[in-house]
């Protein structure tokens, strides 16, 4: 009995980790196990008070607690061969560039950090994008090392059991959840990813408790433009394209049922496990060094923002405005001007939401222009407006008066402009 009863810090349940003389098919303590334990203590020690025995089991388990993921990671020894850079190419045919390397490395370090420091800040979702049958879900399952540490059962966030479905899992796949989400649910997903803990009560507990997150989330999509159109950026979602025809090892082939290949299937599966284990060992080496951050560098963030556009619907209005600005010779513009001249609403007045959309495009999708907050005078019919000014290179001539027209003296007097301005005119 010594050392057999332990609390599993990943599942927050009691495990029996040694054979105790009766049939068991899972380490987790069950009602049948409790009956056997009661019988054991009665026959060997004459103890018959059920509550005291169960309380003693809980205390012993807590004194002998363990974390299976941390134990697995601590036991790894890296052999020095770099695998993180090539892993997604090996199994899914992805590129081996710096972006793909940084994306997977960040995801692995986030998973390690969540195991050793539950509740640490990590809100990034690695999203694998490619056709059906590419092996995206199988990759996340393989990455979790132990199938019990993986789950793809999280289908919707308004499920009352959503937190219970996270319990005991290290890597959770959210398949197609982003692709089928609307604007409101996307914000819910972002908020969900940003949380560091949940407060809830598991069965048989009297009081709810804070449960710090020990898991990370992976996403998969068969649809290329799965990201919502968000000009401010979708920094939580890190997409990586997969090309299964370029993969060196196709995960799904290891699971074919043909008997003549079953031995080879298991050999390949074991080789894949060894590869994944060594990749985790490489990530642990980085983690132990302490020389990492759970976020991208500014340069990689800039690349991510540009890269994400390949996974968003076409932004036609931004395209119209960019085309207009390329042909426009003036040095300042305002939102009403862009509404009428760039978007072609010659006779309409813009609604507030349309002006906000133009502001969003200019502030997040356009380069070479910066906003100014003090209103300036524009040609008729725009008059006095806030807007944007062109950012000039040092070698460019100053055309800052472009787009202005002379205001008559009578109109300047009506506007109440300073008298010295009138004299200058």
Model-predicted segments: where are they?
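Conserved AAA+/SF3 P-loop NTPase catalytic/coupling segment centered on the Walker-B
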Residues: 171-193, 227-233
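AAA+/SF3 P-loop NTPase mechanochemical coupling elements
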Residues: 162-167, 202-220
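P-loop NTPase catalytic core of nucleic-acid-dependent motor ATPases
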Residues: 57-167, 336, 343
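Structural recognition of the conserved hydrophobic beta-strand(s) that form the central parallel beta-sheet
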Residues: 173-174, 214-222, 239
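N-terminal nucleic-acid engagement/recognition segments and initiation subdomains in replication
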Residues: 1-83, 98, 102, 348-349, ...
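Conserved alpha/beta core segments of nucleic-acid transaction machinery
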Residues: 286-330
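Conserved catalytic/switch belt of AAA+ P-loop NTPases
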Residues: 186-209
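A short helix-turn-beta junction within AAA+ P-loop NTPase domains corresponding to the substrate/partner-engaging
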Residues: 229-247
């Amino acid at each position: 009995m010594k050392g057999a009863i332990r609390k599993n810090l990943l599942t927050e349940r009691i495990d029996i980790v040694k054979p105790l003389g009766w049939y068991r098919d899972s380490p987790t303590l069950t009602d049948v196990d409790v009956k056997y334990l009661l019988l054991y203590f009665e026959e060997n020690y004459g103890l018959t008070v059920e509550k005291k025995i169960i309380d003693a089991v809980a205390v012993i388990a807590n004194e002998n607690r363990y974390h299976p993921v941390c134990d697995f990671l601590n036991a790894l020894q890296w052999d020095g061969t770099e695998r993180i850079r090539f892993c997604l190419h090996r199994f899914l045919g992805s590129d081996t560039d710096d972006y793909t390397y940084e994306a997977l490395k960040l995801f692995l370090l986030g998973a390690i950090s969540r195991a050793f420091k539950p509740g640490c800040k990590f809100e990034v979702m690695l999203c694998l994008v490619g056709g059906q049958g590419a092996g995206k879900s199988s990759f996340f399952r393989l990455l979790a090392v132990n199938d019990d540490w993986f789950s793809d059962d999280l289908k919707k966030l308004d499920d009352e059991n959503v937190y219970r479905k996270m319990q005991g899992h290290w890597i959770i796949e959210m398949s197609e959840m982003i692709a089928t989400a609307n604007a409101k649910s996307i914000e819910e997903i972002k908020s969900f990813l940003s949380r560091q803990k949940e407060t809830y009560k598991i069965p048989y507990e009297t009081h709810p408790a804070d449960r710090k997150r020990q898991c990370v989330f992976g996403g998969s999509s068969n649809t290329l433009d799965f990201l919502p159109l968000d000009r401010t950026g979708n920094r939580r979602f890190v997409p990586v394209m997969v090309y299964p025809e370029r993969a060196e090892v196709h995960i799904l082939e290891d699971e074919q049922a043909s008997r003549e290949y079953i031995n080879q299937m298991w050999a390949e599966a074991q080789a894949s496990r060894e590869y994944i284990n060594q990749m985790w060992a490489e990530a642990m080496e980085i983690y132990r060094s302490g020389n990492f951050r759970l976020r991208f560098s500014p340069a990689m963030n800039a690349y991510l923002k540009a890269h994400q556009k390949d996974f968003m619907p076409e932004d036609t209005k931004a395209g119209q405005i960019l085309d207009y600005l390329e042909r426009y010779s003036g040095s300042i513009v305002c939102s009403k001007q862009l509404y009428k001249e760039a978007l072609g609403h010659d006779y309409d007045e813009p609604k507030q939401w349309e002006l906000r959309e133009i502001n969003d495009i200019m502030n997040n999708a356009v380069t070479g222009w910066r906003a100014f907050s003090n209103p300036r005078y524009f040609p008729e019919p725009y008059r006095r407006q806030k807007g944007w000014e062109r950012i000039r290179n040092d070698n460019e001539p100053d055309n800052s008066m472009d787009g202005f027209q002379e205001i008559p003296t009578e109109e300047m007097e009506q506007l109440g402009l300073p008298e010295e301005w009138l004299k200058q005119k």
